[in-house]
Amino acid sequence: MECKTVFLNGDFLKNSVNVNLNRLATVETLLRHVLGDSYETVLERAYLTHQSRIVHPDIQLCKLEGKSTSAHLNLTLCTRVLGGKGGFGSQLRAAGGRMSKKRNEQENQDSCRDLDGNRLGTIRQAKELSEYLAKKPAETRAKKEAKKQKLNKVLAADSSSSRFDDHEYLEDLEQSVSNVRDAFQNSLLYRRGSTSASSFSSGSNGATTDEPAEKEARNNNSSINSWSRRMQASESSNEAEGEDSESQTSKSLYEWDDPLYGL
C-alpha cells in the first residue's frame, strides 16, 4: 500500500509535523491523527490550505497531488479571521460607476475614432444635421402659415389707424380757424388805425411812423397763412399714409397667394 508523507504546519502547531499516511486517506484522518479528538474544535477556528487553495476535510490526499510528482504534501492550518458586515464590494462598484460616468461626461471624445476610422465628432455632427434637415420643412411651413394667419387677422379686424371722417368737426375747426384769423386781422387794423391817428396829430412824423406798423401787419398775415398751409399739408399726409398701408397689406397677401410673384 503506497503511503504519502504530509507536512502540516500552522498557527495551532508549535512545530511542523510530518505524517506518513495512505494516499487514499482523507484530510480529516490526518487532522485526527495529529490533533486528536480536538480537531473538530480546531476546524471551527481554522481551515486548511494547499498551494494557497482551501482544502475541504473530506478530500483524499491523492487528489491533492495533481500533476506534481513529489512524494510529500505541504498543508497549512490557517486561523479564521472575523469578517465584517459585508456590502463593501457593492459600495466600491457603485462608487466606481459614478466615477466613470463623471469622467465620461467631462472628457471630450470627439477626436476619438470608431472601428471604421470615423471620428466620433464627425458622426455626431452628421446626425444632428440630418435631424435638423428633417425638421426644417415642417418648421418653415408652420412659420409661413402663422404669418399668413396674422396678415388675415389684421385685415379682418378694424384697423387702429383708421381715417378721421367726422366732417362736422372738420367744418367747425375750419370755421374756428377763420374766425381767429379775422379777429387777428381786425386787431391789427385797429392798431394800425390808432397808430396813424396819433401820427397825424403829431405832424410831419406821421408818414415815418406808419411804415413799421404796416410791416408788422404783413408779417402777421404771412405767419397765419403759413400756419394754415401746414395744417392742410398734415391732413393730406395722413390720408396718403392710410392709403399706403392698405396697399402694402394687400401686396403682402398677394405674395402669399401667388407663388410665382417676383420671379
From Swiss-Prot:
Regions of compositional bias (Basic and acidic residues) in chain numbering: 102-117
Keyword entries, A-Z: Cell cycle, Cytoplasm, mRNA processing, mRNA splicing, Nucleus, Ubl conjugation
Effect on the protein of changing residue 85 to P: Abolishes cleavage at Gly-84. Growth defect
InterPro entries, per database record: RNA_Proc_DNA_Dmg_Regulator, SDE2-like_dom, Sde2_N
Chain segments carrying region Disordered: 95-118, 137-158, 194-263
Positions of the pro-segment in this chain: 1-84
Function in brief: Plays a role in pre-mRNA splicing by facilitating excision of introns featuring relatively long (>21 nucleotides) spacing between the branchpoint and 3'-splice site (ss). Recruits cactin to the spliceosome which may enable folding of RNA between the branchpoint and 3'-ss, to guide the splice site towards the spliceosome's catalytic center. Required for proper chromatin organization by assisting splicing of components involved in genomic stability and telomere organization.
Protein name according to UniProt: Splicing regulator sde2
Annotated source species: Schizosaccharomyces pombe (strain 972 / ATCC 24843)
Lineage: Eukaryota, Fungi, Dikarya, Ascomycota, Taphrinomycotina
